[in-house]
Regions:
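Positively charged n-region of N-terminal signal peptides that target proteins for export
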Residues: 1-4
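Short amphipathic alpha-helical "recognition" segments used for binding
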Residues: 6-7, 120
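Bacterial N-terminal signal peptides
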Residues: 8-18
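Buried hydrophobic residues that stabilize the cores of well-folded domains
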Residues: 23-145
Length: 145
């Protein structure tokens, strides 16, 4: 019985520390913004000055944690592009983005690796067939100036 309790406490502590670390990577402003965006859909509209014709310009969809999971850009003829995002449950950081064209076909898949301090480390760019296209490495240089 004692072993079970100590494992449970250890597991709970580990989960608590992981959540605390993930939350500490976000600034208070970022946390407040996420809170305001929970389960939100934002539609942006444009209006032609001469004809007063109105059309949908952009849609952003946020999940129950306030993270943008889909963004769609429109033109007068319809969808220009769309991006969907997936997030790591532990850190809350985006781990994958899929870009779609005006015909709603995937054109690029981006997968991300993050440094322990919450900054991007690498971005892997894949073609729709799954073939690795390129790798972007992020370098952060701080100056004393």
């Amino acid at each position: 019985m004692k072993k079970f309790i100590s494992i449970s406490i250890c597991t709970l502590y580990s989960v608590f520390c992981t959540l605390l670390m993930a939350q500490s990577l976000l600034t208070p402003e970022q946390l407040a913004k996420r809170e305001r965006h929970k389960n939100l859909t934002v539609k942006e509209w444009n209006t032609d000055e001469k004809t007063q014709t109105r059309w949908l310009d952009r849609i952003k969809v946020y999940d129950n944690q306030g993270r943008c999971v889909e963004e769609i850009e429109y033109a007068t003829y319809g969808q220009k592009w769309r991006v969907t995002s997936k997030y790591d449950d532990k850190t809350g950081k985006v781990i994958e983005e899929v870009e779609y064209n005006d015909r709603n076909r995937a054109t690029r898949i981006k997968k991300y690796e993050w440094n322990e301090n919450g900054t991007k480390a690498k971005q892997y760019n894949y073609l729709p067939n799954g073939k690795l296209f390129s790798i972007k490495v992020y370098e952060y240089i701080f100056s004393d100036k």
